[in-house]
Amino acid sequence: MIRKAFVMQVNPDAHEEYQRRHNPIWPELEAVLKDHGAHHYAIYLDKERHLLFATVEIESEARWEAVASTEVCQRWWKYMREVMPSNPDNSPLSAELKEVFYLA
């Protein structure tokens, strides 16, 4: 498995709405993530800085990257753009983080 971590932002007035929209996520989005080899996906909120820290284990970079082109992911991004800063294609602004320590 490949471990990934990334950081995103949530609008200051949208913390509760962001969480509501993820509990639960759409069943079809969950299915796409699993079908594309995502496991142990978690998102954490830093309320003071309005940051989202996400971790996920993936089976392959290619399969993970393919999620973005699915119809359900495109709909999800459009749905979420109201609560978080987004790119012109509606994908959330995000930065991948480099792993500097891991304890198995």
Swiss-Prot record:
Superkingdom to which the source organism belongs: Bacteria
Name of the top EC class for this enzyme: isomerase
Catalytic activity of the protein: alpha-L-rhamnose = beta-L-rhamnose
Active site, renumbered: H22
UniProt-listed Enzyme Commission number(s): 5.1.3.32
MF-aspect GO terms: L-rhamnose mutarotase activity
Keywords: Carbohydrate metabolism, Cytoplasm, Isomerase, Rhamnose metabolism
Chain ranges passing through the membrane: none
GO biological processes: rhamnose catabolic process
Gene Ontology cellular-component annotations: cytoplasm
Binding site for substrate: Y18, Y41, W76, W77
The family this protein is said to belong to: Belongs to the rhamnose mutarotase family.
Record-linked HAMAP family: L_rham_rotase
Function according to Swiss-Prot or TrEMBL: Involved in the anomeric conversion of L-rhamnose.
Binding partners and assembly: Homodimer.
Protein name per UniProt: L-rhamnose mutarotase
